A protein has these predicted regions:
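Predominantly five- to eight-bladed beta-propeller fold
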Residues: 61, 106, 117-122, 128-130
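Hydrophobic beta-strand segments that make up the repeating blades of beta-propeller
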Residues: 1-4, 46-50, 104-108, 163-168
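Beta-propeller blade termini
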Residues: 29-40, 80, 87-98, 102, ...
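Blade-edge motifs of beta-propeller repeat domains
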Residues: 1, 7-28, 65-86, 122-146, ...
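Short, solvent-exposed loop/turn segments at conserved positions within beta-propeller repeat blades
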Residues: 6-7, 56-62, 113-119, 168-171
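A generic tandem-repeat structural signature
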Residues: 26-69, 74
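Short, small-residue-enriched loops and turns at beta-alpha junctions
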Residues: 54-56, 112-113, 139-142
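Beta-propeller domains
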Residues: 138-180
Length: 181
């Protein structure tokens, strides 16, 4: 369970018998989290998304975290994800290039200095457990996408390639069609 600013997150096991406090991030609002096997080693790793508006003067507070699971112990990976300086609202897994590993879609939440202005969202390609943003003219729709509040991976046009539907404040429902990876 992610925590709002001032409260640590809590990790519960599947049956709710054990809980473990996630400390060290109480100054950050954790807006989303997702378990997935980022390095294809058979266990679930954890991506924690940072968001909120409380840290307008501390952009470092918006650094997401990727926790790598090794034999049930999670360690923070310092070098597998890029620097994130804009509050996020959703993190999704998607194998957009159908190469067999899970890539990430990170949505932007707000422009801290201009509420209402559209912000970027990012698609991160998974290369052996490390993530880098996908750039280029085929991904211009992610620039200034909007103040996204929710997103879902779906195959809208039934072409066997995953697309993404997004909704948000002051924006239209938007479909990001995958043009074959």
């Amino acid at each position: 369970m992610t925590g709002s600013q001032g409260f640590n997150g809590v990790f519960f096991d599947l049956l709710g018998r054990n809980e473990e406090r996630v400390t060290g991030r109480a100054f950050v609002e954790e807006t989303d989290a997702i378990f997935f096997d980022c390095d294809n080693d058979g266990d679930e790793d954890l991506y924690i998304l940072s968001g909120g508006i409380e840290n307008i003067f501390n952009e470092g507070a918006y650094q997401d975290e990727l926790l790598i699971n090794k034999d049930g112990n999670f360690t923070i990976s310092q070098d597998r994800i890029e620097s994130t300086k804009i509050p996020g609202s959703k993190i999704l897994t998607i194998d957009f290039d159908q190469d067999g590993d899970l890539d990430l879609f990170r949505t932007g939440q707000i422009d801290l200095r201009a509420y209402g202005r559209p912000v970027d969202s990012w698609l991160y390609s998974n290369e052996e457990g490390s993530f880098s943003s996908v750039l280029g003219p085929n991904f211009d729709d992610l620039k200034d996408l909007g103040m996204v509040t929710d997103a879902k991976v779906v195959d809208i046009n039934n072409d066997q390639w995953p697309d993404i539907a997004v909704v948000g404040e002051w924006m239209e429902v938007t479909i990001l069609f995958n043009s074959l990876g």
